[in-house]
Amino acid sequence: MSVVGKRVVDELCRVVSSYLGQSGQSLDLERCIDGAPVYAKGGATAICTVRMQHGCVYHLEFVYKFWAHLLEEMHYPFSPCFVISNNGLSTTLKCFLCRPSDAVSQFGHVLPVESDVYLAKNTSVVLGQDDFTKFKASLVFSKNLGVYNSMVICRTYFTDYRQVLQFLVVTPKSHKRLKSLLETVYCLAAPVADSAAQGGAGFPTNGRDARACTSDVTAVYWAGQGGRTVRILGAFQWSLGRAVALVRRSWPWISAGIAFLCLGLVWMRPS
C-alpha cells in the first residue's frame, strides 16, 4: 500500500473509532494489516472491522456520510459500503471503500434493511447510500431525507440464540445546531482530504475535538419515538443499577429489620 493510501486508511479508521459508538463506548476495532487496495474497485479487503456488542448504539449513517465526504474530497470515484454479518461466532461491521464484488459468497444471504433484522448465521446486511435513503423514505417526509434532518442508527440485541439489529431513524431537536456541529466536524476533516488529494505529508487530526464533536452531535439528536426509547432505556438501566447497588450496601440492615419484624409478629400472635 502506498504512503498516501496508508494515510487514507489511517484517517478513515480514526473516523470510525471517534464517531461510530456513543460517547464513552469502547470499540473492538481491527484495521486491515495486509495493505488494502485503496483505489481498487470491488476489493475484498475491508478497511476496518468492528466487532459489534450487545446493547450498543452505532451511528452508521453518520460515519458513512463522513466517509463519503472525505472520499469525495479526495476525488475517489466510488461510494463506501458497510457490511454487517454474522459468521456464527460474532457479528461484525466491515467497512469497505466500495461494495465488494463477492459480498454474497463472503458474508452469506443479504437481508434487507428493516426496523428489526434477525441476523441468523451466515446472513448479512449490506449498507450503501441508497439503502439508508430507502429505509428513511417510509419513515420521514422526503424533505427530511438529508443528513441535516435525519440519520439512521443501529441498536443491537445479542443473546446466545439470537442476533437482532434494530434500525432507527433519529431527527435532531435543533436543525441549526446540528448543521453547525456537522459543518465543524467536516471542517476538521477538510485539511485531511486536501492533504491526501495532494499527497501531503500528514493528516492533522485532533482527537479531543473529535470526541467533543461526537458528544455534541449525539446530544443534539432527538428521535421521535426511537430516540426517546434509547434515552429512557439508558436512564432505566442507570436507575436500576443504582437501586441494586443501594440494596446490596443496605442488605445487612434490611435483613436485620426483616428478622425483628418476624419476631415481633411471633410475639404478638395470640396464644
UniProtKB/Swiss-Prot annotation:
The keyword Membrane applies. Residues 1-249 are perinuclear space. Keywords: Host membrane, Host nucleus, Late protein, Membrane, Phosphoprotein, Transmembrane, Transmembrane helix. It comes from the Viruses. It is a single-pass membrane protein. Phosphorylated. One of its GO terms (cellular component) is membrane. The chain crosses the membrane at residues 250-267. Forms a heterohexameric complex with NEC1. Plays an essential role in virion nuclear egress, the first step of virion release from infected cell. Within the host nucleus, NEC1 interacts with the newly formed capsid through the vertexes and directs it to the inner nuclear membrane by associating with NEC2. Induces the budding of the capsid at the inner nuclear membrane as well as its envelopment into the perinuclear space. This is Nuclear egress protein 2. It comes from Human herpesvirus 8 type P (isolate GK18) (HHV-8).
